[in-house]
Design a protein with these regions (language model features):
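SAM cofactor-binding core of SAM-dependent methyltransferases
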Residues: 19-104, 114, 120, 180-185
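A recurrent flexible, glycine/aromatic-enriched loop bordering the glycosyltransferase active site
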Residues: 119-127
Length: 202
């Protein structure tokens, strides 16, 4: 099962963000209440969503992917028990690419911001990072209860890299946070591309 959230208007998205933990807790309780779960967090950033999951559900194992070194160090200190931190990005190809780290860490991405959101545009630094493929890391038929993807424009490429696990039904619940179409430059996909792709596996 897939859960996608997409809003055309920024105001609607902000309203959702302030209510999302309440809504999502109700939804996730339908699947995972009183159960130990295996959780994968792609784009963990500062760990806010991971903290929400740890607070409200029993975690058997958590696998977190975050390409920014400094954030990974903090995540390991704060969430070490039952949590494995991967200091890398995911995509559908293994190769080195530019990664833009913004003053607001949650905006960091493989893609530069458009001028539409100038308040989010301050680049702190640009680094080169190696992207890895989900299916090559999770290649032992691990059953994943819940996988969340929030990758600032790279979401579709990540999904392509997890096609084997999707085909095998190894992921019970999938949440993908899709960016506004005008936030980043040169993002090679749209919301409909992602939706149509995921429909192949239902």
């Amino acid at each position: 099962m897939s859960l996608l959230k997409y809003y055309q208007k920024l105001d609607d998205a902000v309203a959702y963000l302030f209510s999302s933990t309440i809504n999502e807790k109700k939804l996730l309780n339908q699947f995972f209440k009183n159960k130990e779960i295996t959780f994968v967090d792609i784009g963990t950033n500062m760990g806010n969503y991971l903290s929400f999951i740890q607070k409200n559900f029993k975690i058997k194992n958590a696998y977190c992917f975050e390409p920014i070194n400094e954030l990974c160090e903090n995540l390991q200190k704060k969430h070490g028990k039952n949590v494995k931190i991967f200091n890398c990005a995911l995509s559908n190809k293994e190769k080195k690419r530019k990664f833009y780290i913004y003053e607001i860490p949650s905006q960091s991405s493989f893609y530069k911001q458009n001028k539409t959101y100038s308040s989010l545009q301050k680049i702190k630094k640009i680094i080169k990072i190696e992207s890895k493929i989900f299916d090559k890391i999770f290649n032992k038929n691990l059953k994943i209860d819940f996988c969340k993807i929030d990758a600032q424009g790279e979401d579709f490429q990540i999904l392509k890299g997890m096609s084997k696990n999707l085909k095998k039904g190894n992921i019970k619940l999938l949440k993908v946070e899709v960016c506004f179409p005008d936030v980043h430059k040169d993002v090679p996909n749209s919301y409909l591309d992602i939706l149509n792709y995921l429909n192949k596996f239902n």
